[in-house]
Amino acid sequence: GLLANLGHLEALLEGLGHPPGRVQVVAEEDPDALEALLWGPPPPPAAGSGDFLPMGGKRALLRLVADRLHADAPRPAEVVALPEGAPFGRVVVEAAGCTLCHACVGACPTGALEAHPERPMLRFTEDACVQCGLCRNTCPEKVIRLEPRLAFGPAAREAVILKEEEPARCVRCGKAFGTKSSIERIVARLAGAHWMFQDPEAVERLRMCDDCRVVSQ
């Protein structure tokens, strides 16, 4: 609602060095008191007049305004922490627990999280993240958390690698499939412990792609 959005703006201004109370909600029933407030001396502007064209959607306009406030800030900061629920922020992934299943990629509505087309990799673009939480709720390993904040500079608009692993390669044809660590975990769990994987040839099929497993049987 309105109060939540004003809270986000107040946090941004304070993070950029402005004193508290720059954003206020006037709830006054007395018309004379309201008139006195409206005609009173205004506070100094938080930023000079902008020289940008207000083009794009709501999020693009918010970014333009935030960049202008950052340029004229008393104490510019590269990153400003925001309250929970703010529509800007980053996704933090505990890399050790991530299996690169890419469930989060499929759930992300803005494309902030993306997979690499050729390698087991998870990439993230902070500027596209709206902190909806779908990735966190979808993650089967529960290794994703949200960090509401506003980052300035070109780094926020560039994709960063959150997790990358060596791909598993089929021992028969060399085709890449899955991640090497996940395949080896499966081998360690099943080899000798399951009746279907008592002989070395059956275990070796676990290290083959789907096509080669069919051919080798």
Residue spans of the language-model regions?
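Ferredoxin-type iron-sulfur electron-transfer modules and their immediate structural context
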Residues: 2-121, 127-128, 138, 142-192, ...
